[in-house]
């Protein structure tokens, strides 16, 4: 079997259609075409074509995952979950079910994102702590829980929380300023603040400082 034509895709000129014996077989990124030595006239057996089809799937999935990472910083666990969903079989409108992607392929995408420094749990956690509900207010306990749920190592969480300039006293004042009108009753407001992860003594002090004595 022989590669008989290469052509840029209309919707994505950076991706190249590869034709084998006059029939479309798969698409590859321009970078993959160069790295894999793909050219018209190249003769390949079925086993090699199957390998190249996996490379095609890898290139497509990597671009999707990269675009996902560029939307905002993500943790490794978030992207692993994203890739898992992308790799599952899908039911087409025709009723046909697509084959899922092998776990080795999604792991390879994840490893490349880490190697290219598009994924870094430390920098993600630092960004999360600096920006999460900055105006609305959030307890450090809630931030700790959120980071743990996103797969961040406990040592990283401890280090960054110790270095953070955010503190519960300031965060409480932010929330009280926004929620006091909704919870005019002091006890109800205290229960709400406790549900957000603040401890009782800090809540009492914050309400006293805020002259919320109803």
Q: Predicted segment positions?
A:
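An alpha-helical, amphipathic repeat domain used for nucleic-acid recognition
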Residues: 1-214
């Amino acid at each position: 079997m022989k590669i008989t034509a290469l052509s840029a895709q209309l919707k994505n000129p950076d991706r190249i259609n590869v034709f084998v014996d006059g029939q479309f077989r798969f698409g590859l990124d321009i970078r993959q075409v160069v790295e894999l030595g793909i050219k018209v006239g190249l003769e390949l057996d079925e086993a090699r074509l199957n390998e190249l089809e996996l490379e095609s799937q890898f290139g497509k999935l990597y671009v999707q995952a990269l675009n996902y990472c560029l939307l905002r910083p993500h943790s490794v666990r978030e992207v692993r979950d994203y890739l898992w969903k992308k790799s599952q079989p899908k039911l087409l409108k025709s009723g046909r079910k697509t084959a899922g992607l092998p776990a080795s392929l999604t792991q390879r995408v994840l490893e490349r994102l880490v190697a290219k420094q598009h994924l870094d749990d430390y920098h993600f956690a630092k960004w999360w702590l600096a920006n999460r509900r900055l105006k609305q207010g959030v307890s450090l306990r809630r931030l700790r829980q959120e980071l743990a749920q996103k797969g961040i190592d406990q040592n990283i969480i401890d280090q960054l929380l110790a270095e953070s300039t955010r503190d519960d006293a300031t965060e409480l004042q932010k929330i009280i300023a926004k929620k006091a009108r909704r919870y005019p009753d002091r006890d109800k407001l205290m229960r709400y603040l406790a549900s957000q992860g603040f401890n009782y003594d800090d809540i009492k002090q914050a309400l006293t400082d805020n002259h919320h004595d109803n």
